[in-house]
Swiss-Prot record:
Belongs to the class-II aminoacyl-tRNA synthetase family. Homodimer. The gene is hisS. It is an enzyme of class 6 (ligase). It catalyses: tRNA(His) + L-histidine + ATP = L-histidyl-tRNA(His) + AMP + diphosphate + H(+). It is found in: Cytoplasm. This is Histidine--tRNA ligase.
Length: 421
């Protein structure tokens, strides 16, 4: 029988690593509470049509990266490749963005894409999503960017990341620009890289995002998207940059920054780092003011971003920003297996009264000698002995495992006071 192994592109989070996730998640919640965003929890499976209509039929994600299947009713379902489409579906279905309502939401969970696994890019990956609905003005653009900015400062990595900004204009602006770009690229068709040639028919704007040096040289003299954007949207983008200057948020303009999802309009942004090789983007987002309406809801302004949690953890590890985990318990109990009905009751009472303490014991209840060996390995400061003699006399034995002090006795009714010291 063959050995069962984990599916390629998927990862186990081992006990020694889970504390890193808990630390990061606690920082995330701290920042989002500060901005008064509410958590929502979304299903990992949605109808395939949702992603076809939102992410886009021609996008790389829908065309070749989704995990699709049919259920027993013959319905086409998809493991979510990103979170925004499902969040918008929830907002529409539960009437959360009607009659001028506003929503500030966040979620964190696994997403799935069939990509070539590499460092920082997995087939199951965790993503933090932050979304705001019903806000038209620049203030929400600044707030959403400030959330990521605050998180990176809280984590101590702000100096290692760069905010890149661009504006995609309106849908009509992009259509006009796309035609101009295609016209410009006609003479260079044979010189473009393979992926860019495919994108000519499906999503020409994605050619701007090509990492191929030869393609970038061809694009150097191409028409600029900013020249096709309406005056009011250009002014809004300029004002956004001015407000970021006032806040002290560093950024750079990237006229080739386009998002791989079809629903983005207006402002788009990425936070990137040069510490993770090719997987440089750790956060990406922008406005998608037409998406709610496109999926059957009322016309609703919307903006959001996503952070790849694995990439963020990799960056924190590479920069030495994660503290070592302290697996040591505080107290280790040495118990007589013949008297467990009494001694376990004492242990559980202490756990209830002092929930801040990490308490452990040898649940195999071997000899006292073997239990003491495990107590020494546990890292506990104190071992508490409850054997037959201790139960008969009403006193627990106290052995200090990290200090050269004599063993003491403490009455059972004083144990909690002793441990609180």
């Amino acid at each position: 029988m063959s050995k069962l192994t984990i599916v390629r592109g998927f990862n186990d989070v081992l006990p020694l690593d889970s504390y890193k996730w808990q630390l990061l998640e606690s920082k995330v919640k701290l920042i989002l509470d500060r901005y008064n965003y509410s958590e929502t929890r979304l299903p990992i499976v949605e109808r395939s049509e949702l992603f076809h209509r939102s992410v886009g039929e021609s996008s790389d994600i829908v065309s070749k990266e989704t995990y699709d299947f049919q259920d027993r009713n013959g319905d086409s379902l998809t493991l979510r490749p990103e979170g925004t489409a499902g969040c918008v579906r929830m907002v529409i279905e539960n009437n959360l963005a009607t009659r001028g309502q506003t929503q500030k939401l966040w979620y964190c969970g696994p997403m799935f894409r069939y990509e070539r696994p590499q460092k920082g890019r997995y087939r199951q990956f965790y993503q933090l999503g932050v979304e705001a609905y019903g806000f038209d003005g620049i203030a929400i653009d600044l707030e959403v960017i400030a959330i990521a900015w605050s998180l990176f400062k809280e984590l101590g990595i702000y100096e290692y990341v760069t905010l890149e900004l661009n504006s995609l204009g309106s849908s009509l602006n992009r259509q006009e620009y796309t035609q101009a770009l295609l016209q410009y690229l006609k003479p260079y068709h044979a010189e473009l890289d393979e992926d860019s040639i495919k994108r000519l028919d499906k999503n020409p704007l994605r050619i701007l995002d090509s990492k191929i040096e030869k393609t970038q040289k061809i694009l150097a003299n191409a028409p600029k998207l900013i020249d096709f954007i309406d005056h009011d949207l250009r002014l809004r983008f300029k004002q956004t940059c001015q407000y970021l200057d006032a806040l002290g948020v560093r950024y750079k303009l990237n006229e080739n920054l386009v998002r791989g999802l079809d629903y983005y309009t207006g402002l788009v942004f990425e936070w990137t780092t040069d510490k993770l090789g090719s997987q440089s983007a750790i956060c990406a987002g922008g406005r998608y003011d037409g998406l709610v309406e496109n999926l059957g809801g009322q016309k609703t302004a919307a903006i959001g971003f996503a952070i790849g949690m694995e990439r963020l953890l990799l960056l924190l590890e590479d920069l030495g920003k994660l503290p070592n985990q302290d697996n040591a318990c505080d107290v280790f109990f040495i118990l007589d297996s013949a008297q467990l009905h009494q001694s376990l009751a004492i242990v559980e009472n202490i756990r209830q009264e002092l929930p801040q303490l990490k308490i452990d014991m040898d649940l195999k209840f071997g000899s006292f000698k073997s239990q003491f060996k495990k107590a020494d390995k546990s890292g506990a400061k104190v071992a508490i002995i409850i054997g037959q003699d201790e139960l008969d006399n009403g006193f627990a034995g106290i052995k200090f495992l990290q200090q050269n002090e004599e063993q003491q006795q403490v009455a059972f009714n004083e144990l909690i006071n002793f441990l609180e010291r």
